[in-house]
């Protein structure tokens, strides 16, 4: 690094450029750039100059005595002497780095922006420094500086934003404030997502699969309010936005670069009357998109915006008006143009008769009408007419060309002749007339233009001459045309960075038949449960599941992007070849993750089963193969060919496994974190895919995870009280015992008692030791306490989500007598079994339909409770000294437990009475034979 030579102690002059004072040829420049007599801090300029000279007197020669002390440069007589004196006087400045700096200053000039630091210092050094205040004021401002809300910690911002957690629109807007708000809002927004559209749920699944860290924020998920795609009581306008729809964001998609709404007018009044298309609920041809539209988002047939239901309906309604308007304009311009012969006659300057037309040909107006309708359907806002756009640009071009003609000089070799200008003007007018503008020229110019188009030689010559004429003025005309066109026609731009700038899309017309469904594929639910381990509140009420399959490969290779030739190793990963974006590069785990259908994978599976390796040598026998995937010719690489061919065959070994709804319960019970699993809340109301075995396995699996904590301390029993489930009105039979809402302890009691109640009489006799010979044997059971009514042996309850992975859990049921209301508890008294203790009120019997005991129907699927029954006021208040109360059907789990217990006790009484009668009969028979 070059050393710095300090030539003066006046630091205020360091920013002043010395180039103008020392090296400019004009001597008066130094006077202009000389600083004022008073410096920045009040010192005299002559004093500063004198000090500067005194510090450098060792570097000066005797020739400096001839220079006046009042001025450093102005007293030099000639240029030669001035330069030599300057070199000697400022020798300390003439270093290697200084020479380079002076050269750059000379090249760029003193006012160049390349050295903005010098120019900034120069402009600021001439002005005195303005102090902001005293030191006390500065200290006070530093100490009492106001803090902004963005300076708060993230934890405090999260607590503030949690007050608006129910307003998702406000939370989304907070993401766009700054980085601090983004970091604080993101966990709050993902904590409780809410959805009413299956399309948004599919997007959410792709989002958490692409960014797994977002799934860690999810705590609650409510899918009970999903709606179908039908427009219920809502109408759509030409802006493409559904009014009063919670799923559709209110915005205007047609915005200009400045943010104003762009308005476009149609060519004719007929087209203008049909621009606004109103679609009501009576029209079933328009619906909002669902998860199937998101699944086929990369398919060119289903993802085309032209083919969605709204644009397709609008295109059909606008096509007749556009066709009529353009056909009228074309007939006005070319009244005799109806066939090929008339077209040829028109090119020769003749007119054709209206009669004797052999075939009707498609005119340019019909083609333009179709193109116009398709292009205008790309926009969901105001109808953009191609006629207006193109005609405006053509008018500007014609004006520019005429202006260039008048300003051209005859001596210019690049100047065009009069014939050329007439051709350019006629061609521009023909283009204008083609798009519906009125013509001011005669029919002769039109015929000349057609004749020029028909004859190739003339066309080539005219194009060459026209290109020479336009080449000299091409840049000027292009700039002028773009400026004039931008004033009249503003390009519509949608601001994607704004929140809620994208409305809810419409479904494809080929997927319109699924608009009435509000189902979700089973694979999406499993993806959510896998990527949201801290989810502890899940609401799947009113949800319909769509059949889904898991794709299983027979051979798995390490590495997702391993290729053989131009193909991927697995057909699962082969889906990501379609697009290069990140969401499409995800692994295909379930069938709904891919845009391929079931038939595709089934055909891929059957190909490997029915076709041998010899038959696979044919290129067409391998599904989804192209010429680029064909192996290399047989030659020196024969071994590589065989290896690639064998791997291609193994790649087709694909199996499909149908998913079961029980896997939802399995994922909830096994994939959740233990810290949040203790507070788990699952709601599955009004669902048909929930069965008895699913609920039993789900309840026992959660209890097994918490069973090791039971019995250690009393506080651990509170864990099972915090886990709540709801299965109201679920299952094919909605009157099962478990179709209610309660905590884990209540469901365990209902499941165990229901398991006992489902046994036959012989099993119950063995379970509760009803037979006399077993009662007389003291070794078969423990001694009974006086308050013990019935006690069972230890029995096992099998459960499991899969038939080949069944597990067992041991229980013992104890029924005690009490005069207080019913109470139950679940305790783990030993390591090998769990005790279910029920204290039953003995002086109370639950009677339905006037019966003595509860009328509970026992089936193979479990105990079924009867429907609601009104109270029987005519029933006797006393029945053998016991109160009989007729109670209606209730969703209270404690009442259900009491009813099942009463049913078990009633069956035990009947079995004991029959056994007693049988024993009495046997005793009488033995006594009679003994007497005889």
UniProtKB/Swiss-Prot annotation:
Q: Which gene encodes it?
A: COS111
UniProt xrefs under InterPro entries: F-box-like_dom_sf, F-box_dom
Which segments constitute the F-box domain?
A: 146-193
Functional description taken from the UniProt entry: F-box protein probably involved in ubiquitin conjugation pathway.
Q: Which organism is it from?
A: Candida glabrata (strain ATCC 2001 / BCRC 20586 / JCM 3761 / NBRC 0622 / NRRL Y-65 / CBS 138) (Yeast)
Q: What spans are recorded as compositionally biased (Low complexity)?
A: 53-63, 395-431, 438-447
Q: Which Pfam families match?
A: F-box-like
Q: Tell me where the transmembrane regions lie.
A: none
- Lineage from the top down? Eukaryota, Fungi, Dikarya, Ascomycota, Saccharomycotina
Gene Ontology BP terms: signal transduction
Specify residue ranges for compositional bias: Polar residues.
Answer: 346-358, 876-890
**Which keywords does this chain's UniProt record carry?**
Ubl conjugation pathway
Query: Mind telling me what this protein is named?
Result: F-box protein COS111
Q: Where is this region: Disordered?
A: 29-63, 346-369, 389-450, 470-500, 863-893
């Amino acid at each position: 690094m070059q050393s710095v030579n300090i030539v003066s102690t006046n630091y205020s002059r360091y920013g002043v450029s010395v180039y103008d004072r020392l090296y400019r040829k004009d001597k008066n420049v130094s006077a202009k750039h000389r600083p004022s007599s008073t410096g920045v801090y009040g010192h005299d300029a002559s004093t500063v100059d004198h000090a500067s000279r005194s510090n450098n007197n060792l570097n000066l020669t005797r020739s400096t005595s001839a220079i006046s002390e009042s001025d450093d440069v102005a007293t030099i007589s000639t240029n030669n002497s001035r330069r030599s004196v300057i070199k000697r006087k400022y020798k300390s400045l003439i270093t290697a780095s200084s020479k380079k700096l002076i050269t750059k200053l000379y090249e760029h000039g003193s006012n160049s922006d390349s050295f903005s630091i010098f120019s900034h210092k120069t402009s600021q050094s001439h002005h005195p420094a303005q102090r902001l205040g005293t030191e006390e004021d500065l200290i006070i401002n530093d100490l009492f500086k106001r803090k902004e809300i963005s300076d708060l910690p993230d934890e405090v911002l999260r607590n503030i934003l949690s007050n608006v957690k129910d307003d998702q629109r406000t939370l989304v807007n907070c993401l766009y404030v700054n980085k601090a708000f983004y970091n604080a809002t993101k966990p709050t927004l993902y904590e409780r997502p809410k959805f009413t559209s299956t399309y948004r749920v599919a997007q959410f699944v792709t989002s958490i699969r692409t960014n797994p860290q977002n799934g860690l924020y999810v705590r609650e998920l409510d899918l009970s309010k999903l709606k179908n795609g039908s427009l219920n009581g809502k109408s759509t306008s030409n802006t493409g936005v559904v009014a009063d729809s919670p799923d559709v964001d209110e915005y205007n998609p047609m915005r200009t670069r400045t943010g104003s709404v762009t308005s476009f007018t149609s060519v004719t009044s007929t087209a203008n009357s049909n621009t606004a298309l109103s679609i009501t609920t009576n029209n079933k041809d328009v619906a909002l998109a669902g998860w199937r539209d998101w699944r086929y988002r990369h398919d060119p047939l289903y993802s085309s915006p032209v083919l969605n239901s709204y644009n397709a309906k609008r295109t059909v309604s606008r096509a007749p008006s556009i066709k009529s308007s353009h056909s009228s304009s074309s007939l006005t311009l070319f009244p005799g143009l109806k066939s090929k012969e008339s077209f040829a006659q028109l090119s020769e300057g003749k007119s054709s008769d209206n009669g004797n037309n052999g075939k009707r040909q498609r005119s340019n107006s019909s083609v333009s009408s179709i193109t116009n309708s398709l292009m205008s359907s790309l926009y969901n806002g105001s109808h953009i007419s191609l006629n207006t756009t193109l005609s405006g640009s053509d008018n500007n071009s014609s004006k520019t060309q005429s202006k260039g003609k008048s300003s051209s000089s005859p001596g210019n070799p690049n100047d065009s002749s009069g014939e050329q200008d007439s051709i350019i003007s006629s061609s521009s007018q023909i283009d204008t007339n083609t798009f519906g503008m009125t013509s001011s020229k005669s029919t002769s110019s039109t015929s000349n233009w057609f004749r020029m188009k028909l004859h190739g030689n003339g066309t080539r010559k005219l194009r060459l001459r026209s290109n020479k004429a336009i080449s000299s003025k091409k840049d000027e005309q292009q700039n002028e045309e773009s400026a004039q066109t931008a004033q009249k026609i503003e390009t519509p731009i949608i601001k994607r960075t704004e929140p809620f700038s994208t409305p809810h899309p419409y479904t494809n017309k080929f997927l319109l038949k699924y608009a009435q469904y509000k189902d979700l594929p089973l694979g999406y639910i499993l993806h959510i449960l896998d990527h949201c381990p801290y989810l502890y509140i899940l609401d799947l009420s009113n949800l319909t599941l769509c059949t889904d399959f898991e794709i299983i490969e027979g051979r798995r290779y390490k590495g997702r992007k391993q290729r053989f030739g131009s193909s991927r190793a697995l057909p699962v990963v082969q889906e990501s070849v379609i697009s290069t974006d990140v969401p499409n590069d995800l692994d295909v785990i379930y069938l709904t993750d891919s845009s391929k259908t079931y038939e595709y994978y089934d055909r891929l599976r059957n190909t490997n089963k029915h076709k041998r390796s010899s038959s696979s040598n044919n290129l067409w026998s391998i599904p989804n193969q192209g010429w680029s995937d064909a192996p290399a010719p047989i030659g020196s690489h024969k071994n590589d060919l065989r290896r690639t061919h064998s791997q291609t065959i193994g790649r087709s070994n694909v199996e499909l496994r149908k998913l079961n709804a029980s896997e939802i319960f399995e994922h909830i019970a096994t994939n959740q974190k233990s810290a949040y699993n203790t507070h788990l809340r699952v709601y599955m109301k009004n669902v048909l895919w929930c069965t008895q075995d699913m609920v039993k396995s789900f309840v026992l699996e959660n209890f097994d995870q918490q069973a090791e904590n039971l019995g250690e301390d009393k506080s651990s029993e509170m864990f099972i009280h915090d886990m709540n489930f709801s299965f109201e009105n679920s299952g094919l039979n909605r009157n099962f015992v478990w179709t209610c809402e309660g905590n884990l302890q209540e469901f365990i009691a209902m499941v165990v008692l229901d398991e006992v109640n489902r046994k036959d009489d012989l099993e119950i006799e063995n379970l509760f030791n009803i037979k006399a010979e077993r009662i007389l044997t003291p070794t078969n059971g423990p001694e009974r306490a006086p308050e013990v009514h019935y006690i069972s042996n230890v029995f096992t309850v099998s459960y499991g989500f899969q038939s080949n992975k069944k597990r067992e859990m041991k229980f013992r049921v104890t029924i005690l007598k009490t005069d207080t209301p019913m109470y139950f508890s679940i305790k783990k008294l030993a390591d090998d079994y769990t005790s279910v203790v029920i204290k039953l009120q003995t002086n109370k019997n639950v009677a339905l339909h006037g019966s003595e005991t509860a009328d509970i129907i026992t089936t193979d699927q479990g105990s079924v409770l009867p429907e609601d029954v009104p109270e029987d006021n005519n029933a006797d208040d006393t029945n053998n000294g016991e109160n009989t109360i007729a109670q209606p059907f209730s969703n209270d789990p404690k009442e259900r437990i009491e009813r099942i217990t009463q049913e078990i006790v009633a069956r035990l009484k009947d079995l004991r009475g029959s056994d007693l009668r049988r024993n009495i009969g046997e005793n009488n028979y033995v006594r009679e034979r003994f007497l005889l």
